[in-house]
Amino acid sequence: MGARGMILDRLGRELRDLRISITDRCNFRCAFCMPEGQDYEFFRREEILSFEEITKFVKAIIPLGIKKVRLTGGEPLLRRDLERLIKMLSELPMEDLSLTTNGFLLKEKAKALKHAGLKRITVSLPSLRDEVFSKLVGREVKVSHILEGIEEALRVGLKLVKVNVCVVRGLNHEEIVDIAKFFKGMGVIVGR
């Protein structure tokens, strides 16, 4: 703890951002994210924090200097009634509430998320090519489906849409410039 009651990292810097994994479930099996093998043991439902517990925790930690909260997973859009959690958190005094997703369910959920109070969204998009994308995420997926979700997020007015590209040498490392060019002028930030 810092002198002003702030949470400090190992280098003595004030922590202002909080990432909360609201589920360990995911509809993808990304090589760069999920544990290998079929024997991965997910948390039991009763081991996952309830929306009320998450909100209580965030409310308690805001006075310690937290300004931004990012919801992650697994895939947070798989969490049932996620919009209710977004609404609960958006009513707390913080600067930013965002979510990181693989984008597969975004087209269907963007409007409700925005309406509930979500401000920003980050979509993991490792490739614009279906075959490379599918190989990296461990299931057959049309990239166009993810792009439609990003377009919907922009259409409903999410203020900041970011695309993260996990670069894997030999698979998608040559695509980063193409991905940046693809989103240029669309109001989407591309990062890695």
What are these regions (language model features)?
Residues 10-49:
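Canonical Radical SAM [4Fe-4S] cluster-binding loop centered on the CxxxCxxC motif
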Residues 2-17, 177-181, 185-187, 191-192:
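Auxiliary Fe-S-binding modules of radical SAM enzymes
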